[in-house]
Amino acid sequence: MFLDKLGVDKSNWSELFSACVGKATLLQKRAFKLLVEGSNWQVDFDSSKIYFDGREFDMQFIGSESFSSNTWLWGYENINGFDERLLELANKAREFGEKFGLSAFSKPQFELDENFNGHTISMILCTAFDEQNYYRIEYEGGAAYVAFRSDVIFEEPVLANELLSIVNECISSYELDHKIFIKGLLLSCGIKFSESPNEIVSDKYELSFKFDELNRLINILSKL
């Protein structure tokens, strides 16, 4: 688990999200471009499969949002009586939450808000465990979230312009610990870096990220 190498507080939702959101955003963008966009999709919960234009992938059920009660319900509660094979990832989340005191993972049901919802939960879960993608399936009264893994998403190396695009998008969209975010993105992408109190320099692409005393990103230098 790359979180071990990163050294974040696994009981701290903000640190976990900061560490995972970069890679999750990158994977979701790649999946949309390579698989989802313009595709006909189909889900088979009995066989634990998801299909995009006939391409088949193993699937895990994460959980669901209820529009009427505005709540999240974890898949490990298994109110639908799914095969346990479909719930392995959700059960890992529960074990993680119980071990590290992360209530968003260990509490079966809770109210949704901008910080705790299907998207943010799936981003952390799919990046922390196996770097999978997730897909949102909306239905009458709610939405289900499922995870899947496709090797095609990982075939192309992460380019500098792709990396910088993710940095700009995430920092403008979420409240993050910028330093944890940059380190998490680089580490989860397999990009080595060196670190000083106010700067992170990636060995690849000669990128320099500079921070103020509050870990806020104040400058990016690149030779692009």
What are the residue ranges of the model-derived segments?
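Surface-exposed beta-loop interaction hotspot
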Residues: 79-176
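Short, exposed beta-strand/loop patches in secreted or surface proteins that constitute
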Residues: 33-45, 137, 191-195, 199-200, ...
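Short amphipathic beta-strand/extended segments with alternating polar/hydrophobic composition
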Residues: 54-64, 147-148, 207-212
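Secondary-structure transition/turn motif
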Residues: 51-56, 77-79, 149-152, 201-206, ...
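Beta-strand-connecting loop/turn residues
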Residues: 46-48, 70, 141-142, 196-199, ...
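Short, solvent-exposed secondary-structure boundary motifs
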Residues: 27-35, 113-129, 181-192, 199-202
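Alpha-helical oligomerization segments
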Residues: 158-224
